[in-house]
């Protein structure tokens, strides 16, 4: 007889090395592979794991383990993708929380539904995308977000979230604040407008298109996708070859007065004006100016081509990476008066 959909096998003393892109060999007291929302719900009532802290892991691309996790790690393996409806203005596509983000983006293009191409090759899963409100090359996920479904880990209840309830911000959402650790995102629906125009405001994208002989004004979604993939592969290390979590720091946003004072001291500072009058600074530029690009502290290092990326050279611990991050933050604050915020969750 087959096991019921909600039945879950528990994996004691489980290695998380293959479940975090830094490759840290942290261990979970117990883990469970989750293939359906019902399995998340059943564990909320399971006496075998009563009272244990819970951590949902997708691709592990936004986490730094500084120690073993003395609780239950839920490995989200809910994989699905489908066009769930369409109207005259848009397609609505849904993907499971454990679906690989890049593969999902590529699928939408293959199905003739553009819009997410600027977010190509961002590591992680679909379920992690709203938590971080991922963004790159002039596009944030929230711009195409429609809704999501999540399981309340305490009660097992399935809850629907719209954009307002998610409270998206810059690399931020409800799930990083009041909702942190409380929900498992099992499905996300995106609205992809049929009236598509390329997002090519970033100079890197325009340059890559030009290098390929493509007029930016005539670029197709696949052209933008290919350009973004090429840029990211040139700048960012492959986690399978060199452990990392992508961009480790957020680009800081400061008010106009603080920026004017900073630019008076640093005329060539890289910056991006924001609609609200504030100014976003390039964290990588700040780190590079402090002399950190390519430097190492033990087996943890700043990547030689992209100062935003911290890497595990082999044998580094989460504590080593965190020590490097703190040293960088201290130097940037001391030189520029700007505080860098780390993107990954440190446990």
Swiss-Prot record:
Q: In which pathway does it act?
A: Cell wall biogenesis; peptidoglycan biosynthesis
Where does the record place it?
A: Cytoplasm
Q: Which domain of life is it from?
A: Bacteria
Annotated ranges, domain FAD-binding PCMH-type: 24-195
Q: Which cofactor does it need?
A: FAD
The protein's enzyme class: oxidoreductase
Against SUPFAM superfamilies, the record matches this protein to: FAD-binding/transporter-associated domain-like (SSF56176), Uridine diphospho-N-Acetylenolpyruvylglucosamine reductase, MurB, C-terminal domain (SSF56194)
Catalyzed reactions per annotation? UDP-N-acetyl-alpha-D-muramate + NADP(+) = UDP-N-acetyl-3-O-(1-carboxyvinyl)-alpha-D-glucosamine + NADPH + H(+)
What keywords tag this UniProt record? Cell cycle, Cell division, Cell shape, Cell wall biogenesis/degradation, Cytoplasm, FAD, Flavoprotein, NADP, Oxidoreductase, Peptidoglycan synthesis
Q: Which GO terms describe its biological process?
A: cell division; cell wall organization; peptidoglycan biosynthetic process; regulation of cell shape
Q: Which Gene3D superfamilies match?
A: 3.30.465.10, UDP-N-acetylenolpyruvoylglucosamine reductase, C-terminal domain (3.90.78.10), Uridine Diphospho-n-acetylenolpyruvylglucosamine Reductase, domain 2 (3.30.43.10)
Keyword Cell wall biogenesis/degradation appears in the UniProt entry: yes
Tell me the active site: 171, 247, 343
- What broad class describes the main subcellular location of this protein? cytoplasm
Q: What is its EC number?
A: 1.3.1.98
GO CC terms:
cytosol
Any one GO MF annotation of this record: UDP-N-acetylmuramate dehydrogenase activity
Task: Please report which protein family the annotation says this sequence is part of.
Answer: Belongs to the MurB family.
Q: What does this protein do?
A: Cell wall formation.
NCBIfam families tied to this protein: murB, PRK00046.1
Name recorded for this polypeptide = UDP-N-acetylenolpyruvoylglucosamine reductase
